């Protein structure tokens, strides 16, 4: 059931196998994004992870917005069998992750090295192009200066004779310096590439093992114990050196009762960490997922009437820039935080901020194309009348055919459903591995052991929630996804306005 491997030495140009970790419930968004952004194939999933094949380089991989972390896949297989009481036998099972198929490890390391070298070359070429442009500008300035002096010679030939000679000498010196500098940079560029190759030589690698263990194996061993066993096996088999503080390579291993996955983190920083967000509000992956559902088109009027720190608008404006965005809130502190985020992201001229109440929007009826908002959670926010008043005002300003995407708490969502058994969790009949929107991809009892490609399971779960939702006035539910916010769960719900509300 292990992942099929390419020939050893095959690079990313032949398509490499990756996987992303995702917040619970966001797997369908990651799957859509890798297909659309990376032209990914062989897209599969298990709870919390999405696997795919792509030829994309690091620059494109960095652009993923819905995923948490990205890994180059080494191995994916059934869980380890922990039936023996002998720790030695269990440790041998762990070591088989390395010893049983060393080719998959060497192939992954080769692809990882090629990705880094290709990225380094592109970075160097970009810097060299910038330097060449600067040199060209400098040469043009010298030529312009020389022409100006020649014009002055016609009027004051005697006085400027010496100056012309001096400028000619400066020009020759500058050209000589430019030639030497360019030659030096080319040599430096070549040295850096050779150094990169030496640094990533497979025999001289330094590494660290990071483990996550849950289920039966998590009860029997700590992550540190497993990491030590795996680390020793790697050192013996490949001759690499352990370095816990500053390794060249990190090995990630996740072991549980459902699967065993081994990979290499492609980036040290999480994809969900946005450099352009100064103060985080709603998690960026959730905000991007909401915006991706809204069908944003160039020229649209997009409103977030409860914008908080503006995370949803920031994510939307970065991805779909040619749009008129408006953020509103009643809190001065929230709006100040949003403004700081806009300045940090360079989006001050893209998003307009208003201090207004969501139930008294100073906008004409049917004037807004899209509304995206995180409905506030917590004890201070009353259910019932308040949530309905908010939806009524959103319905009023939204034009017919427009879209609303909301993040609703479980209580808010329950209030808007016709589910009579509201005290029963929506996924109560599912096992702990069958999250809403997720169908089991790995069934240990199946002889084939194949990870299934997702096609209809997400849609089936989506319909499961939609069946419990009824239209609110002219707002018709279209999609609904249950997602994790960490300590609590919420629902991303999409509505379409079917007809004039008459308000």
Curated annotation (Swiss-Prot):
Enzyme class name: transferase
Primary residence: nucleus
Catalytic activity: guanosine in U6 snRNA + S-adenosyl-L-methionine = N(2)-methylguanosine in U6 snRNA + S-adenosyl-L-homocysteine + H(+)
EC number(s) per entry: 2.1.1.-
Domain named THUMP: residues: 161-266
InterPro entries listed in its UniProt record: RlmKL-like_Mtase (IPR000241), SAM-dependent_MTases_sf (IPR029063), THUMP_dom (IPR004114)
Residue runs in coiled coils: none
Tissue: Expressed in a variety of tissues including brain, colon, gingiva, heart, kidney, liver, lung, placenta, small intestine, spleen and thymus.
Pfam families linked: THUMP, UPF0020
UniProt GO cellular component terms: nucleus; tRNA methyltransferase complex
Gene3D superfamilies attached to this UniProt entry: 3.30.2130.30, Vaccinia Virus protein VP39
Keywords: Methyltransferase, Nucleus, RNA-binding, Transferase
Alphabetized GO MF terms: RNA binding; tRNA (guanine) methyltransferase activity; U6 snRNA (guanine-N(2))-methyltransferase activity
Compartments reported by the entry: Nucleus
Free-text function comment from the UniProt entry: Catalytic subunit of the THUMPD2-TRM112 methyltransferase complex, that specifically mediates the S-adenosyl-L-methionine-dependent N(2)-methylation of guanosine nucleotides, most probably at position 72 (m2G72), in the U6snRNA of the major spliceosome. This modification in the U6 snRNA affects the constitutive splicing efficiency of introns that have suboptimal splice sites and can impact final mRNA levels.
Subunit record text: Part of the heterodimeric THUMPD2-TRM112 methyltransferase complex; this complex forms an active tRNA methyltransferase, where TRMT112 acts as an activator of the catalytic subunit THUMPD2.
Family of the protein in this entry: Belongs to the methyltransferase superfamily.
Protein name: U6 snRNA (guanine-N(2))-methyltransferase THUMPD2
Gene source species: Homo sapiens (Human)
């Amino acid at each position: 059931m292990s992942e099929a491997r390419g020939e050893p030495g095959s690079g990313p140009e032949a398509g490499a196998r990756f996987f992303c970790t995702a917040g619970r419930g966001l797997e369908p968004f990651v799957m859509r994004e890798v297909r659309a952004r990376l032209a990914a194939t062989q897209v599969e999933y298990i709870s919390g992870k999405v696997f795919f094949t792509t030829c994309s380089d690091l620059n494109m991989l960095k652009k993923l917005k819905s995923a948490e972390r990205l890994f180059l896949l080494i191995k994916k297989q059934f869980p380890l069998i922990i039936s023996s009481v002998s720790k030695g036998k269990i440790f041998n099972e762990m070591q088989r992750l390395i010893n049983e198929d060393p080719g998959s490890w060497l192939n992954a390391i080769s692809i990882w090295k090629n990705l880094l070298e290709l990225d380094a070359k592109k970075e160097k070429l970009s810097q060299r192009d910038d330097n060449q442009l600067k040199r060209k500008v400098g040469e043009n300035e010298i030529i312009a200066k020389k022409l100006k002096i020649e014009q002055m010679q016609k009027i004051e030939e005697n006085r400027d004779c010496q100056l012309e000679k001096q400028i000619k000498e400066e020009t020759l010196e500058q050209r000589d310096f430019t030639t030497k500098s360019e030659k030096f940079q080319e040599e430096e560029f070549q040295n850096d590439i050779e150094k990169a190759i030496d640094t990533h030589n497979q025999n001289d690698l330094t590494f660290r093992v990071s483990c996550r263990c849950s289920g039966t194996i998590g009860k029997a061993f700590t992550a540190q114990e497993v990491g030590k066993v795996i680390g020793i096996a790697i050192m013996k088999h490949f001759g690499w050196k352990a370095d816990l503080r500053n390794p060249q390579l990190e090995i990630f291993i996740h072991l549980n009762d459902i699967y065993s996955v081994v990979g290499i983190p492609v980036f040290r920083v999480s994809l969900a960490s946005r450099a352009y967000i100064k103060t985080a509000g709603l998690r960026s992956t959730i905000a991007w997922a909401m915006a991706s559902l809204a069908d944003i088109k160039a020229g649209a009027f997009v409103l977030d009437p409860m914008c908080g720190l503006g995370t949803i608008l920031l994510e939307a404006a970065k991805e779909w820039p040619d749009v008129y965005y408006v953020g509103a809130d009643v809190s001065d502190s929230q709006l100040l935080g949003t403004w700081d985020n806009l300045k940090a992201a360079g989006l001050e001229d893209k998003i307009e901020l208003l201090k207004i109440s969501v139930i008294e929007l100073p906008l004409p009826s049917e004037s807004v194309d899209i509304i995206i908002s995180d409905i506030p959670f917590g004890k201070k926010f009353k259910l019932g009348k308040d949530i309905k008043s908010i939806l009524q005002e959103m319905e009023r300003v939204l034009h017919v055919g427009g879209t609303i995407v909301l993040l609703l708490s479980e209580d808010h969502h329950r209030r808007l459903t016709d589910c009579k058994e509201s005290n029963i969790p929506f996924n109560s009949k599912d096992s702990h591995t069958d999250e809403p929107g997720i169908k089991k991809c790995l069934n240990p009892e199946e002889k084939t052991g194949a990870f299934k490609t997702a096609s209809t399971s997400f849609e089936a779960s989506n319909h499961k929630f939609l069946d419990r939702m009824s239209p609110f006035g002219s707002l018709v539910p279209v999609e609904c996804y249950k997602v994790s916010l960490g300590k609590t769960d919420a629902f991303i719900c999409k509505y379409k306005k079917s007809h004039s509300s008459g308000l």
